[in-house]
């Protein structure tokens, strides 16, 4: 099926006229501001069409959001496509290969709308989502652990040099 057949593709718009608030504004680089007006609520997949076209964003069910002018968002037909599955699918598609510009990367709405996507049964989609989300949680845990190890390494290294500056050898562990 084509993307335009699995859901509605809606355009983002400029957010500068709105006041500060709690609704996240998504642009091609991610969340750039929070305003007082929601454009829609999740589930939705936000797809940048100018700038960082390789990054897609998922908005969870019931979460209000505002889609900025450099993006479009897709509201999936619930009887056809799980929005989280579409998010993972688009992440694997490497949308940057559809780049239509030599300067600022851009993805035409028409190319996105006409892109063919794999649409398995909903039960299969939900199983894939559970598996991929579980893997992403595990990866995040590993990244957090590596960050902690890096912080410990930095502190230990600094301590070693402080002791060496004072003419003492660090204690062996």
What are the language-model segments listed below?
Residues 11, 94-97:
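Structural motif corresponding to the C-terminal cap of alpha-helices
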């Amino acid at each position: 099926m084509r993307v335009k057949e699995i859901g509605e593709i809606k355009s983002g718009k400029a957010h500068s006229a709105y006041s500060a608030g709690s609704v996240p504004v998504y642009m091609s680089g991610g969340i750039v501001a929070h305003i007082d007006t929601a454009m829609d609520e999740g589930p939705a997949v936000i797809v940048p069409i100018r700038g960082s076209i390789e990054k897609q964003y998922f908005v969870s069910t019931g979460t209000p959001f505002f889609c900025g002018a450099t993006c479009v968002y897709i509201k999936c037909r619930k009887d056809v496509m799980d929005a989280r599955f579409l998010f993972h699918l688009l992440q694997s598609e490497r949308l940057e290969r559809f780049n239509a510009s030599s300067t600022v990367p851009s993805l035409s709405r028409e190319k996105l709308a006409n892109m063919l996507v794999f649409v398995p049964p909903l039960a299969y989609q939900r199983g894939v989502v559970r598996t991929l989300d579980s893997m992403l949680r595990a990866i995040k845990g590993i990244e957090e652990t590596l960050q902690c190890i890096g912080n410990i390494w930095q502190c230990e290294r600094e301590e070693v040099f402080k002791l060496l500056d004072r003419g003492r050898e660090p204690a062996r562990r």
